[in-house]
């Protein structure tokens, strides 16, 4: 298995499928892993639980929903940004929440970008493709 470049953390299967489809059409989803909640995301990132023993390479970007079961996106973001080994991983919140407290909290915790999911399919598709191009091909993270 290749190193995961995009970790998609999304509990809504329709949104996950649209995101994967948009990235696949532009050949940006070759190394994408979809997890369904925040607990699974943290297990993957920290190589614990069902991911224990996996090669612990870090994704190039995490696309993170906020409103999820078990562990919500804000809790995931807080754990990632407060941990020395993961604080530099770019995290893009991709959510339906336009709530100012959510936006403020995410930026206070160190989110790299906060994107409200467009309602229309074509707008959603375009936004996801642009995110993929930027975070995988244009952005230069620290090594």
What is the meaning of each model-derived region?
Residues 70-71, 80:
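Hydrophobic residue at a beta-alpha junction
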Residues 10:
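Conserved acidic carboxylate
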Residues 40, 119-132, 136, 140-143:
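C-terminal output helix
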Residues 66-68:
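Receiver (REC) domain active-site loop signature in two-component systems and cognate sites
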Residues 92-94:
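Hydrophobic/aromatic residues positioned on beta-strands within the core alpha/beta folds
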Residues 112:
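Short, glycine/charged-rich "phosphate-handling" switch motifs in NTP-dependent
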Residues 18-20, 33-61:
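Acidic, metal-coordinating helix/loop segments flanking the phosphotransfer/catalytic sites
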